[in-house]
Every structure is written in C-alpha cells, then in structure tokens.
Amino acid sequence: MSVYPECTWLLFVCLCHLLVSAGGSLLLPCEPINETISVEKDGCPKCLVFQTSICSGHCITKDPSYKSPLSTVYQRVCTYRDVRYETVRLPDCRPGVDPHVTFPVALSCDCNLCTMDTSDCAIQSLRPDFCMSQRASLPA
C-alpha cells in the first residue's frame, strides 16, 4: 500500500479545517453599521427615509441535533446593547396627528436573545427602508 493516499487524506482534512477557520473570520461581526431606514405613521402621508446606525452582523449559534421537548433552545442574534434615541418630524401630517417619531440609534451591539419588544426577530422581514406611502428625505 502506498503512503500517498494517507498523505492525500491528511492534506484534505487540513485544507477543510483551514477553510472552515477562514470562513468564520470572513463573516461580519455584530456591530453598528450605517443603514438607510424609513419611518411612517398613520395620519402622515409621507414616509421619511434617512441614514442611521443599526446593529447588524453574525452571531455564533448552535442548533442541537436532538431537540428534546423538555428543553428550550435559545438562539442569539445581533441586537442593540447601548442606544441613543433621536426624534424626527414627518412632513405634511394631518391636523391633530403628532408628526414626531422617535427611533433608536445603535451605539454598540451585542449577540444576545432577541427581544420582541424592541427588535424585528423575523426570519425574513422587509428591508429597513421599505415604505408603504410616498417617500420623503431629510433635508441635507
């Protein structure tokens, strides 16, 4: 038996390990990024589109092969750690409608459990700049 098949197998295993290690470092970490978002509300005919900081990136998760009905699996997602709140004014709102909308600005992010009260935890959601009504932009 030749020594080459064993060396080939060892080389294959080493290359697979390197590719897996490199692949993990190519994923973007969970951190604040600049993103175009939109805000709108009932009684205001225009959707306001602007840039802000949101949390985005990869969090290491584990999904067990065996899922026991007695245990709970917790998946970590990239979510806000520290935030600052800013307020914008929507244009052309009807009389009696408060034109102000307050939104979080990401100062730092963390891989943590998804909080449904403050985050969109859907598997697939709308783009952050999706508008149902006519678009308007913040003045430069």
Curated annotation (Swiss-Prot):
SMART domains documented for this protein: GHB
UniProt source species: Anguilla anguilla
GO annotation, cellular component aspect: cytoplasm; extracellular space
Record-given protein name: Gonadotropin subunit beta-2
GO molecular function, one term: hormone activity
Subcellular location: Secreted
Family matches, as Pfam families: Cys_knot
Function: Involved in gametogenesis and steroidogenesis.
Annotated CDD domains: GHB_like
GO biological process, one term: G protein-coupled receptor signaling pathway
Keywords assigned by UniProt, alphabetized: Disulfide bond, Glycoprotein, Hormone, Secreted, Signal
